[in-house]
Amino acid sequence: MDVRLIMKSARNAVIEIADGGIYNTKETYHILLNGEETFSTDTVINSLFDLKPQTKYEVLVKTADGVERGNVSFVTAYEFVTLNVRDFGAAGDGKQDDTKFIQAAILACPKESRVLVPKGTYRITSLFLKSNLRFELAKGAELVADTDRASYPKFPGVIESYDETSEYNLGTWEGNPLPMFAGIITGLDVENVLIYGKGTINGNASKENWWKNPKVMVGAFRPRLFFLSHSQNVTLCGVTFKNSPSWTLHPYFSDNLKFYGVTINNPSDSPNTDG
């Protein structure tokens, strides 16, 4: 059996327990991090969180009866600074609209640095990613989307170029260039982005709002919970996505995307949330 390092950053890592299983391992294992038992697992892909930058870690995998089955060592990446969204004005009380405060932290974040969303409930509309961003949703942190359509930016389907020889496509709906509301989390032409943690992104959709008359365009078509357009080298790790207004994860003309331990929770009868 092999224990492999799949990815690492300054604050998290992903390991693979290759015992012949596909999604689930053939037995339950205990994970020790620098000698301390961290958790038990029966899945092949496992995420490690709450790590420290530029720190050496050894991961040891044992069976339930204490037999060592494999290990892997690594040193976490460098981190320059952490920008806590609370320091930018976010309240995390579920009442204040925290969009502009979190967006300010994202725009202010330098390379090799982290935007941290600590425990709390953050009411938002659309957040826009930028390149070279590490964005952590801590355990107990939840981004909850507003359901007021008037609060969301709109993406036109097609914008004609000045010389009328080409066009710029922004909005999309079911394969056609049509107006759409910006995604709850949106990345346009971004690269080298990491979104990770034990937190939740909640689209807050229900049959009282986004899922009511879902095929009818009201202002624009429904937003995606996570929308990437013409982007590359984007990694999602550990985050839970729930109650999406439409498609949950929608990569559009994007490359080299990685998803590790992501959870998607939508009602089985919710419209178009299977993406």
Enumerate the predicted regions with their spans.
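Extracellular/periplasmic carbohydrate-active domains that bind, remodel
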Residues: M1-G275
